[in-house]
Amino acid sequence: MGYCSGRCTLIFICGMQLVCVLERQIFDFLGYQWAPILANFVHIIIVILGLFGTIQYRPRYVTGYAVWLVLWVTWNVFVICFYLEAGDLSKETDLILTFNISMHRSWWMENGPGCMVTSVTPAPDWAPEDHRYITVSGCFLDYQYIEVAHSSLQIVLALAGFIYACYVVRCITEEEDSFDFIGGFDSYGYQGPQKTSHLQLQPMYMSK
């Protein structure tokens, strides 16, 4: 009963991860955030494999899913540090999330709740010609906190998924080991010990 509930919980967690990361992927595409797009794509593939392993009782797939979650948590911690500008990171000058190939920022920067975008003219000399220079004001919630909330949710789901993945792998392994020792589908018939008769041969004498 416990194994069934743990397996069903892991399936639910995987489903939640897929929904949340697909939502995040859409907005990362709109903001041309190439590094998060690549990370999200890999995460989607691994979660699908983990979901398949959970449904089909494949411990190797679930183990691979659990290992990936460690890397996924690390990535999301980095994203949080990036947007909160921890250490030497700067969300304004560093273009890590776009692989330094564009100056795009998070989609939420211009489209957050209550945000008002104003174009600035003339644009500074350093601004690329194919980009517009803007100011954003009036946001109810700054875009960096929205991105931090997205990453925090992913971390919570990943930690829950890691715990239940380890539990499901242990249950599947124990079930397989116990089944092997029992030999449930042994095709050989059971034969009880047979009694052997011991005959004592004695010489016979015949009279002429």
UniProtKB/Swiss-Prot annotation:
Its main location: membrane. Detected in the brain only and specifically in neurons; expressed in multiple regions such as cerebral cortex, thalamus, cerebellum, olfactory bulb and brainstem, but not in the hippocampus. It is found in: Cell membrane. Keywords: Cell membrane, Membrane, Transmembrane, Transmembrane helix. The keyword Transmembrane helix applies. The chain crosses the membrane at residues 1-23, 35-55, 64-84, 148-168. One of its GO terms (cellular component) is plasma membrane. It comes from the Eukaryota. It is a multi-pass membrane protein. Belongs to the NKAIN family. Interacts with ATP1B1. This is Sodium/potassium-transporting ATPase subunit beta-1-interacting protein 2. It comes from Mus musculus (Mouse). The gene is Nkain2.
